[in-house]
């Protein structure tokens, strides 16, 4: 429920159930299959934990330096797009990918950015089936691990990988609404400073053509969670899921969709897109 005294312009903090992995010793495996890799099988044990989730939008409005990519692992940026239809692959390739490259360079200071994939998600099952979209993910996770971050560079840029891996690189994702504001199932992100190294549990990610790794998370009451209420189409959430530097800056940013208990009845299903990039410095 909302914190007492929430009014327009006040922080819309809330409590919601976030689904964490249970460290039972059972291997965590997430396997995708079928056309478009939209079906999945999952092994392992998970459980919901009630967590406070803080309104980052109001805090950032009061202090523009409150959130940054290197301090917290994420930041929200104003980002108008020329894309008319996010479900048109040509518009994504020819318009949106270059927009994302410019944005990631701006936010991170990277000298080179490579877009390597995107995922469209919908909370509407019929739309997912018709357009081969994926569902929102309701388990706390980080998309890359100490091993799978560098491995992704080797897979995508094999001729350059060993030279590129001699210097700093990061994997940075850009997430946004594709149509109406996000009302149902928004995205929550954990402040990277609130993580402990033993919170991270390796999960094997199996695709038809390769095997990767992600991190699932053990519950830790010290985790500090944030979200941006009602994200608009002209905003982009930029967050870091891997950084090769180990100097104290944010390296991993666990995140998850969640059910906002105050979502109004009849709220439109969420539609979102995330783009994944390699950023070299």
Language model segments and positions:
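Catalytic core of Fe(II)/2-oxoglutarate
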Residues: 213-281
């Amino acid at each position: 429920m909302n914190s007492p005294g929430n009014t327009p312009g006040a922080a819309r903090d809330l409590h919601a159930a976030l689904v964490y992995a249970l460290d039972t010793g059972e291997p965590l495996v997430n396997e995708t299959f079928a056309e478009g890799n939209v079906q999945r099988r999952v092994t392992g044990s998970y459980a919901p934990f009630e967590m406070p989730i803080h309104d980052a939008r109001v805090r950032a409005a009061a202090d523009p330096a409150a959130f940054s990519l290197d301090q917290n692992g994420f930041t929200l940026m104003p980002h108008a797009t020329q894309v008319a239809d996010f479900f048109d692959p040509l518009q994504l390739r020819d318009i949106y990918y270059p927009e994302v490259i410019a944005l990631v360079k701006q936010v991170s200071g990277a000298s080179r950015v490579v877009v390597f994939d995107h995922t469209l998600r919908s909370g509407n099952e019929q739309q997912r089936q018709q357009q081969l979209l994926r569902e929102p993910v309701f388990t706390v996770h980080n998309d890359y691990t100490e091993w799978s971050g560098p491995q992704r560079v080797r897979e995508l840029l094999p001729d350059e990988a060993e030279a590129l891996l001699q210097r700093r690189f990061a994997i940075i994702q850009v997430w946004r609404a594709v149509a109406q504001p996000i009302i149902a199932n928004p995205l929550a992100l954990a402040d990277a400073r609130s993580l402990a190294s033993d919170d991270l549990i390796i999960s094997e990610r199996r695709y038809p053509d390769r095997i990767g790794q992600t991190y699932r998370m053990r519950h830790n009451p010290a985790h500090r969670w944030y979200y941006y209420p009602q994200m608009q189409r002209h905003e982009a959430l930029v967050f870091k899921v891997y950084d090769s530097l180990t100097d104290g800056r944010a390296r991993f940013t666990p995140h998850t969709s969640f059910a906002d208990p105050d979502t109004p009845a009849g709220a439109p299903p969420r539609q979102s897109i995330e783009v994944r990039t390699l950023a070299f410095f």
